[in-house]
Amino acid sequence: MKVIIIALVVAFAIRYFLISPVTVYGDSMDPTLHDGEHLFINKLSTPKRFDIIVFPAPDEKGAEYIKRVIGLPGDKVEYKKDTLYINGKKYDEPYLEGEKEKVANGYLTNNFKLEDLPAVKNAKVVPKNHLFVLGDNRRISKDSRYIGFISEDDVIGKVISFGSSLKR
């Protein structure tokens, strides 16, 4: 009996304080993550650039968003001709390459500078203790371009596992 209680306590602690399952709702992270896909998040991990994170939707009570971290505190983020620049340095986004090829006219990600986005209130850099996030499906994603910066304190967890092996 004692072993069962210890096992339950350990399972509870892991589930609520370390690793938690989440489900993708919507298409904003296509082609990387798909609607209905099941994921695991690490609740203790500190997000790094290009990590996929989960956070409470600031504009939908009770909902959660899953997005990719693009900008870290102090970063200047800009898109020019479908190319990401952070602090003036060009970054490749291999997770988008197949999607960029499908765009017949225009760009997958429209040109922008942080200070041109109304949602970030003319900020030139990502503020301290905040993140700039984008969905991989740039044409439909409701992300930092529209909802503003995400507080690091609001991050529920970092995605640590996804793929067909987790689909039900």
Model-derived features with residue positions:
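Soluble "head" domains of membrane/secretory-pathway proteins
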Residues: 13, 17, 35-168
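Alpha-helical transmembrane signal-anchor/signal-peptide segments
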Residues: 22-35
